[in-house]
């Protein structure tokens, strides 16, 4: 999470002055939240990654929009994951591509059957009328959606995430949709804690503590880079010697020839044996994972069957008492 906020740009004080004039028109005052929200770090990482990728592709900060999915039990909402949404601008108003949303929802339902659509997210400063316009479109898909906004340009050390719900207030005799801010808590699972800890260690300056895997990959990258530069230098010398640009140095050419013959030959029987052994090990691990998943599914099926059988057996015995 800290890395998601650290990957931001800079923000000026003039933007804060403009936002301060906009916020009162879309924020409801004196309204308490009606639901309790638990937010998973994976959602924040997804939004931050979405924003950074769009900024890299476009060369400038871009507003991104996506969907929030999770679980809801009564007044308790748990936001567990998210996915991106397509949108386009018509007359300076953002229009969500609903067909794309329904396609993505169907795909997520195949993998995460227990998760449901909870709301949407975007990036930027405090809520403004354009967010109200998008929120009304989301209300056509789901009733009372959540609205999450992440500010990637803030310099504050606090988590730059705010969660809102919509309320209807009477302003000048007209029903007007406003946002009411909700309090939220962070809920993490073991896999998320490991991932967030790894991201937090990998700072943008590279001065932070790196994981063992990262250090190993960095060392390999440096070695391969040095090897590539040396081989390129030898190749350029051989080409220059053939072209007559530099005089032949038989000692250097003999060393290059010997180096080429020292390289391992990948067509040996030992290499083939080790290669096939490794392929078999990888295939076996994948096969064991599939078997484990199948056994778990069968176990759940047997448990449900036993519960149903016991209920039917009790029903038969109860009916037998009256005959």
Swiss-Prot record:
Function of the molecule: Component of the COP9 signalosome complex (CSN), a complex involved in various cellular and developmental processes. The CSN complex is an essential regulator of the ubiquitin (Ubl) conjugation pathway by mediating the deneddylation of the cullin subunits of SCF-type E3 ligase complexes, leading to decrease the Ubl ligase activity of SCF-type complexes such as SCF, CSA or DDB2. The complex is also involved in phosphorylation of p53/TP53, c-jun/JUN, IkappaBalpha/NFKBIA, ITPK1 and IRF8, possibly via its association with CK2 and PKD kinases.
Disulfide bond sites: none
Subunit: Component of the CSN complex, composed of COPS1/GPS1, COPS2, COPS3, COPS4, COPS5, COPS6, COPS7 (COPS7A or COPS7B), COPS8 and COPS9. In the complex, it probably interacts directly with COPS2, COPS4, COPS5, COPS7 (COPS7A or COPS7B) and COPS9. Interacts with the translation initiation factor EIF3S6. Interacts weakly with RBX1. Directly interacts with COP1 and 14-3-3 protein sigma/SFN. Interacts with ERCC6.
Protein family according to the UniProt entry: Belongs to the peptidase M67A family. CSN6 subfamily.
Domain MPN positions: 37-170
Major localization class: cytoplasm
GO biological process, one term: protein deneddylation
Record protein name field: COP9 signalosome complex subunit 6
Location of this chain's protein in the cell: Cytoplasm; Nucleus
Key words of the record: Cytoplasm, Nucleus, Signalosome
Originating species: Sus scrofa
Top-rank taxon, per record: Eukaryota
GO molecular function: metallopeptidase activity
Cellular compartments per GO CC: COP9 signalosome; cytoplasm
Pfam family, one: MitMem_reg
Keyword Cytoplasm: yes
């Amino acid at each position: 999470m800290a890395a998601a906020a650290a990957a931001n740009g800079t923000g000026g004080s003039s933007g804060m002055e403009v936002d301060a004039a906009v916020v009162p028109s879309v924020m409801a005052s004196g309204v308490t939240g009606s639901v309790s929200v638990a937010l998973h770090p994976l959602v924040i990482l997804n939004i931050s990654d979405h924003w950074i990728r769009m900024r890299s592709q476009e060369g400038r900060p871009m507003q991104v929009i996506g969907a929030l999915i999770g679980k809801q039990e009564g007044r308790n909402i748990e936001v567990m994951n998210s996915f991106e949404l397509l949108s386009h601008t018509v007359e300076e108003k953002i229009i969500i591509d609903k067909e794309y949303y329904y396609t993505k929802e169907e795909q997520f339902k195949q993998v995460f059957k227990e998760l449901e659509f909870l709301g949407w997210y975007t990036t930027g400063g405090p809520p403004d009328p354009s967010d109200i316009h998008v929120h009304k479109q989301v209300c056509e898909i789901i009733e009372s959606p959540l609205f999450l906004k992440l500010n990637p340009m803030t310099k504050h050390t606090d988590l730059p995430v705010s969660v809102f719900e919509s309320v209807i207030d009477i302003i000048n005799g007209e029903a007007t949709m406003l946002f009411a801010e909700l309090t939220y808590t962070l809920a993490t699972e073991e896999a998320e804690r490991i991932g967030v800890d790894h991201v937090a260690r990998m700072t943008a300056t590279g001065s932070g503590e790196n994981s063992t895997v990262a250090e190993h990959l960095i060392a390999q990258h440096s070695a391969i880079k040095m090897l590539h530069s040396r081989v390129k230098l030898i190749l350029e010398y051989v080409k220059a010697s053939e072209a007559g640009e530099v005089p032949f140095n038989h000692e250097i050419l003999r060393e290059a020839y010997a180096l080429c013959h020292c390289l391992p030959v990948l067509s040996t029987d030992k290499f083939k044996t080790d290669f096939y052994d490794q392929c078999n090990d990888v295939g076996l691990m994948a096969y064991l994972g599939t078997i484990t998943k199948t056994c778990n599914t069968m176990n759940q099926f047997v448990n449900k069957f036993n519960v149903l059988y016991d209920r039917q057996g009790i029903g038969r015995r109860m009916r037998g008492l009256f005959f």
